[in-house]
Amino acid sequence: MAASMRALLKVRDGFVAGVRCNSQYNKTRGNLKLNGDSRVICQGFTGKQGTFHSQQALEYGTKLVGGISPKKGGTQHLGLPVFASVAEAKKATDPHATVIYVPPPGAAAAIIEALEAEIPLIVCITEGVPQHDMVKVKHALISQSKSRLVGPNCPGIIAPEQCKIGIMPGHIHKRGKIGVVSRSGTLTYEAVHQTTEVGLGQTLCVGIGGDPFNGTDFIDCLEVFLKDPETKGIILIGEIGGVAEEKAADYLTEYNSGIKAKPVVSFIAGVSAPPGRRMGHAGAIISGGKGGANDKIAALEKAGVIVTRSPAKMGHELFKEMKRLELV
């Protein structure tokens, strides 16, 4: 099991390098931006999860305009039209985003269908998508410049008080000035709650997921946050496994330095994790001498990031730094 995971991680690291150099897919980073007018459709709309979270999204105020269920096209669900395919839904509703609540065996096919329909933002919530399926998705992603994938195995993405796409609790979010990006769903909620409590609020929160093969990484989100004039500070939540945090540190060193640098606070989960053992997420494993928490912490601190050892202090540390910089 450990050997097969190490092999997958090597493939993943190769893909990360490929995507980093791929200007085609990088052009879709702007698709992460959401607002109150963002139109959303749902794949797996009439299933148990799709129904529950679509109802939650509607109650939050998200502009959900329809859903997809291949065998129920032409009907209505939650007062919205049901379509037989993503292509049909796109033609009728012109969505900016689709959210996927399809079971693991069919999730990759659902992503590919949305990709072929050129939906700008694809958010896959599904956990347990086979990694060999995601390799195929990754191949398709990096060869195009129309669609951006968030996930799989993630809580989703939310522009507080405007558009909620995913399973996150809406009530803890507040419109404000902090960008949050995280590999961990529950720690995302912790950061959100803390920044709400100290009065900072959030501009955009992205749960990128903890699988080895995902569609959006830290750097994709950091670029959006650094370019957004409304985002005054950033929280980055990482964990053991891979080198995404180290690459994020390199990016911040290059693009977030000097007098106009935005304050960044980070927490890295898994400090006490033993090498070779997966800790929760499929990608959370220290392998081949890489992926340890201490290496990530050192890289981020070298880039000027404030790394807190306690997840309970993320909001407090960011507020303190923003106050020092007279940003609040």
From Swiss-Prot:
The keyword Ion transport does not apply. The keyword Chloroplast does not apply. Its EC number is 6.2.1.4, 6.2.1.5. Substrate binds at residue 189. Disruption phenotype: Viable. During development, results in delayed egg eclosion, reduced glycogen levels and extension of the third instar larval period but without change of the duration of the pupal period or final size of organ. In the adult, results in defects in locomotor activity. Results in disregulation of both glycolysis and the citric acid cycle (TCA) including accumulation of Succinyl-CoA and succinate, and reduction of GABA. InterPro entries: Cit_synth/succinyl-CoA_lig_AS, Citrt_syn/SCS-alpha_CS, CoA-bd, CoA_lig_alpha, NAD(P)-bd_dom_sf, SUCC_ACL_C, Succinyl-CoA_synth-like. The active site is at residue 281. Residues 1-21 form a transit peptide. This is Succinate--CoA ligase [ADP/GDP-forming] subunit alpha, mitochondrial. It comes from Drosophila melanogaster. The gene is Scsalpha1.
